[in-house]
């Protein structure tokens, strides 16, 4: 099977973009890349902001790309922990929203603010995304996921 980038030659209207946020653990950097015909890239250079990324962010992104094999190997670990969250949260009495991302939205939370604060007191930071009776947890390492699930099991829903 072909990758999208292999379809580029001879297709001047095809653009392939990819965010580096999840696979490269760069969520806060807001960085990605675009593959396209050189004429399209030249046209985009004319309209982009002059200082769209800091030098530090650019250097970090280049370092990540140079070590893509190592960085992308982490994706499978993240998927495993996400799938573990999807599997184990219902056993604790929560509903889960199916996810292909690096996080899981779970519901059935009686008081999201209180649970958020209880978890925070255990040094666990999750997100209250403003959906009633729901919270969002990011898939972490195996140890982080275990700690989250074990702690959550001891707290009131």
Explain the meaning of each model-derived region.
Residues 1-5, 24:
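Conserved PLP phosphate-binding loop immediately N-terminal to the Schiff-base lysine helix
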Residues 7-11:
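Short, conserved loop/helix-junction motifs that constitute active-site signature segments
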Residues 13-90, 94-97:
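PLP-dependent aminotransferase class I/II
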Residues 78-79, 83-122, 135, 139:
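Conserved PLP-binding catalytic core of the aspartate aminotransferase-like
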Residues 117-121, 127-157:
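PLP-dependent enzyme catalytic core of the Aspartate aminotransferase-like
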């Amino acid at each position: 099977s072909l990758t999208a980038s292999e379809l580029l030659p001879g297709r001047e209207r095809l653009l392939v973009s990819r965010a580096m946020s999840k696979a490269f653990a760069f969520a806060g950097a807001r960085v990605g890349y675009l593959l396209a015909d050189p004429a399209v890239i030249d046209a985009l250079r004319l309209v982009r902001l002059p200082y769209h990324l800091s030098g530090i962010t650019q250097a970090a992104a280049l370092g990540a790309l140079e070590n893509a094999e190592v960085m992308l190997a982490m994706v499978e670990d993240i998927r495993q922990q996400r799938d573990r969250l999807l599997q184990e949260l219902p056993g604790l009495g929560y509903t889960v929203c199916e996810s292909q991302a690096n996080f899981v939205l779970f519901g059935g939370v009686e008081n999201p603010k209180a649970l958020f604060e209880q978890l925070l007191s255990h040094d666990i930071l999750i997100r209250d995304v403003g959906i009633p009776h729901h919270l969002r947890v990011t898939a972490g390492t195996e140890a982080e996921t275990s700690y989250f699930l074990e702690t959550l099991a001891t707290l009131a829903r």
